[in-house]
Amino acid sequence: DAVIAEVYGGGGNSGATLKNDFIELANKGGAAFGLDGWSVQYISGTPGANSQWGVTPLTGAIAPGTRYLVAEAAGAAGTVDLPTPDAAGSLALSGTSGTVALVRGTDPLTCRTAADCAADPRVRDLVGFGTAVVHEGAAAAAGASNTASVARKAGLADTDDNAADLAAGAPSPTNSKGEVAEGSTPTGPTEPGTVRIHDIQGTTRLSSRTGKTVAGVPGIVTGVRGYGSKGFWIQDPNPDADPATSEGVFVYTGSANPTVKVGDSVLVTGKVTEYYPNFNGGSQSLTQLSGPAVTVLSSGNPLPAAVEVDTRNIPGTYTPQAPAGGTVESLPLQPEKYTLDFYESLEGMRVQVKDVRVIQATDKYNELWVAADKQDQKSRRGGVLYESYEEPNVGRLMVQQQAPAAQQPFPVANVGDVLTGTTDGPLDYNGFGGYTLVAGALGALQDNHLAREVTAQPADRELTIATYNVENLAPGNPDAKFAELAQAVVTNLRSPDVLALEEIQDNNGAKSDGTVDASQTVAKFVAAIKAAGGPAYDWRSIDPEDGKDGGEPGGNIRQVFLFNPQRVSFTDIAGGSATAAVDVAGTGAATALTASPGRIAPADEAWVNSRKPLVGQFSFRGKKVFVIANHFNSKGGDQGIDSRFQAPARSSEVQRLKQATVEQAFVAKLLAADKEAKVVSLGDFNDYQFSPALAALTKDGVLRDLVNELPEKEQYSYVYQGNSQVLDHVLVSPEVGYAKYDVVHINSEFAVQASDHDPQVVRIKP
């Protein structure tokens, strides 16, 4: 439940440190509290007949156990800014007397007495302070001034009596990220308190002390991070006997650089918070101490021993199942049974891995993934294969480092390389990779000399058709990107006869000015291929409607056919446009498209804010071939496999299933007209070979997914969160028959990439 946690009206007044008044809300409940359509309102301490409530509308939500900061009017004095507020208004609160209400709705209240306000069902919570006549309970909260706020007592006390529930003290504004104002933290503790880290962490994912201030928590500093989410980790050198309770915790210092050092013995006073790095995306939370006051007792102390994470102690089952539609947050941790519980029981503690294989290359954020469990299904080139929703690979672990890369270069690793020796550091949680080892010491990098693949040389009688997602290619990209992509087409793909491209942007890239033409983008790429020794490709495409096909805003990404006119001809049939639906005409050998190029059912709801399939009719040695270039909707909005929701929701899957159903019906219509039709459907389908979308595409055998015909260890085209997986596919109709298919691994496993997808090529004999 949401309550008003703190009120301060002295901002910018004489003697004040803070520049602004503020109202701080808190969520005492176990679920998010939505604030859309709500408001905070203020009225003077002694309202008259003409007094009006001032209103600040709110948006968003308060995650369980966190705060929500509303900045109000600024005064002329003060030297310290509030932490970044979650909402802002212009209410000028009195420093000594007034009333604040949390209201369902944004219409001003009309009540001016305590009784009338108590009777108004829109009022969720109310705080009167100073001599305010509108308050909860026997009296208003006392002690507010230019240097003192009124804040709820321990546990966010809420007995509906302002005088009893709130007390005056130094203002301590805290936002939803747990950030506090500079200089607003109290003096460090001098004696250990009664609460230990394992008491804070508890035996579930959420601390039972969330929202409470804990004093004098002892620990040894095991890691310090001075960039990004700044702070440090502490660990109790005297653990309890419960394997479910972590002995480590992150201390969040907000915008302030931490001043402690690894090996310091410290006492920390701070507020227990649960920080969700991606709440709306379903992430789990990180238990942390915010707004800390720290006392260093001694330095140079030995660190608590690191827990080695490996095949011996990582459970084989990834996660417990939550109640229908619910989360695993309240379930007791079973670290011996479930992988996610095992990692949660080590949250904030020192862990280590030894001689681990890199399963996702170093990225631009200076992070990589390793395989802590050597039993996960290995790909042919050293990654781990994602083969089903039920088997997400338990040993995947992200590795970052505590030191900034400018201070300590991060290893540039490819898949299959090895971090030899020991890599150790605290176990963190973030919204991009889940549980993450933030290394203080990194193992030495052993280069496995991974080579970029080159597809087989085709025979002259083979038609080669390829697909390549070129990742938002636009004329303004560096010439080096065009050159690298082009060289791959010529060398690694051996200049395919037909090349279906995805993510070709319009002529001015990600600029929203109505431009949809991509002729300059394509011309620059075609020229780069020719310069790299490739053929003089011709091309066909259809410009989308502005802003209707998703992707990077302003970019208007689309699919494009490149084809080598010396090897294959394109059958141009007028009538194709962004909004016109292609159909099938004729029967038997006379079967043809009604437009070439054309788009499949562009007005169907399946393609809302997504790329429509581009279909073209080609001729190779007198044989007709229909090619469909695809780019299905992305997985944006899906909950991660490490989500607090188990099983995680795959909301984007619904649209891809609709898209697959529409396309399958089109192919079925082609085959009904000509059962011997040669159809190749390929591209970035943004889904797995075991997904409902691919099952729908291959329904009734109208298409077969060639990735399933590769050796199991070669079935991947993309690497995400340490999983080598299939997002790109080539599918063919039954009469294609002979089909030699290859995923050409040149990008996804490498730190240096021209694109994040691997291209694919198929050789057929129409």
How would you label these PLM feature ranges?
Residues D1-N146, K153-A154, D160, G193-G202, ...:
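Activation on beta-sandwich/Ig-like modules and their edge loops
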Residues I4, I23, G65, V100-L102, ...:
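Residue-level detector of buried hydrophobic side-chain packing
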Residues I4, L35, L289-G291, I465, ...:
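Hydrophobic residues on conserved beta-strands that form the core of alpha/beta folds
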Residues S14-L25, T79-G89, A141-A144, T159-P171, ...:
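Short, polar loop/linker segments at the starts of domains and inter-domain junctions
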Residues A16-T17, A170-Y468, N472-V498, T579-V582, ...:
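Extended non-catalytic accessory segments flanking core domains
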Residues G60-A63, R67, A73-A76, A139, ...:
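Divalent cation-coordinating acidic motifs and surrounding scaffolds
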Residues A74, S97, A101-G105, D116, ...:
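Long, well-ordered early-domain segments
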Residues A92-V133, M349, V353-K378, A693-K713, ...:
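Acidic, glycine-rich loop-and-strand cores that form catalytic or ligand-binding grooves
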